[in-house]
Amino acid sequence: MIPLLLLLPLLFLLAVYGKDSKKEESRMVVIAIDGLRWQEVFEGARRDSLMPFLWEMGRKKGCMIGNRNRKSKMEVANGIWKSYAGYSEMLCGVTDDEHIFDNCKQYNPNRSVLELAEACSAYKDRVNAVASWDVIPYILNYRRSELPVDFRSSHRVSKQVRNDSVTLNRALKTLREKHPKLLFVEFCETDYYGHHGKWQKYLNAAHQNDQFIRQLWECCQQDPFYKGNTTFLITCDHGRGESLGAHANRGEVDSQASWTEHGKRIKGSNQTWLVAFGKDIQHLGEMEGGRTIYTKQVAPTIASILKVPFTNDDNQPEASPIYKILK
């Protein structure tokens, strides 16, 4: 009888700390909105009506980086300023202009944080990607990494881009049925309509993506596997031109390029932004000033939150996590 009484406190402590340990496990949903400019996210009275959920969560329960009017700067470190290079930098934490200089379907020689997480026993078979753009599987090098990337559909806005609504539904299905600990979601209609000069459809796509993010968050809040344990990080792969205007001469940066364009000669194309909220994010609201944040810091930030070892092929990190936003 006495040994049993002595064991009771120990059993109680094991139950309490075992529960707390489980609760401490972090899950992440990383969302990219292709080619959405910081101006649409941060400028003017329209911002609260255009992206109400990002503002509700980022301002009150998280952080927002990239409002250049407040001297908060985020940008890509690569010199290409296009989607493949932006996503590779975002997810791999390195720049590789030597090998990545266009949007062709080539297998990425760099390893993404998703691939590194998948290689860890804690995340084995618990990492997924869902994308609207059919180049994402190559950026994640799904042939080498064997990551499950959901991107196929007959419902498409173009040959390479499927409807974002399909991507949302597939992402929700993945959350509910597969319970990944790390999920990457990529929406692409903003960039598609931007390139085609359809301003209202570009804005509609941005607003729609905001509502999609709300649905993904609410899905997580209704599931004990995610509730209280999940961090959302939303960002973009590149910026766009700043205004209407003529093209620059060959080799010059065009400071008056149309918002429909992006690339290494289009001023503003390197400018990005980030909104984060959830379990591991400090409540800093809309941030001001400070050092420039680079898109290559996103991957090590994800790795830091999930406690995934993160180094490049030389066993040295190229970029550090965005420590100031982390709890």
Model-derived regions: residue spans:
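Bacterial Sec-dependent N-terminal signal peptides
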Residues: M1-E24
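His/Cys-centered metal/cofactor-coordination and adjacent catalytic loops
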Residues: G44-F53, R68-R70, E89-R111
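Short, structured active-site-proximal loop/turn typified by the sulfatase FGly-forming signature C/S-X-P-X-R
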Residues: F42-K82
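Histidine-centered active-site microenvironments of extracellular/periplasmic hydrolases
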Residues: T235-F277
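Beta-strand elements within well-structured catalytic alpha/beta cores of enzymes
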Residues: E25-R37, A117, K181-C188, A205-A206, ...
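Active-site His/acidic residue clusters
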Residues: I139-F151, N169-Q215
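Catalytic-site neighborhoods of secreted/periplasmic enzymes
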Residues: D97-Q160
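Non-catalytic, well-ordered alpha-helical segments in soluble enzyme domains
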Residues: S121, G278-Q282, G289-Y323
